[in-house]
A protein has these predicted regions:
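A structural detector for beta-sheet-dominated domains
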Residues: 7-9, 20, 39
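Generic solvent-exposed, charged/amphipathic alpha-helical segments
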Residues: 23-30
Length: 46
């Protein structure tokens, strides 16, 4: 299982703050039950 940490910004968008491991894509479930699919790149600069 890959671990992703995301944070929401004031305008409702979100950004990845940490990625542990790599995966082609990941699906997050929001509190209201909506699903968001994010495309992840092979390398991530922190």
């Amino acid at each position: 299982m890959k671990r992703y940490e995301i944070t929401y910004t004031e305008n409702g968008r979100f950004e990845i703050i940490n990625i542990y491991g790599f995966e082609n894509y990941v699906t997050f479930m929001e509190e209201n039950g909506r699903y968001i699919e994010l495309i992840c790149i092979d390398e991530y600069d922190v």
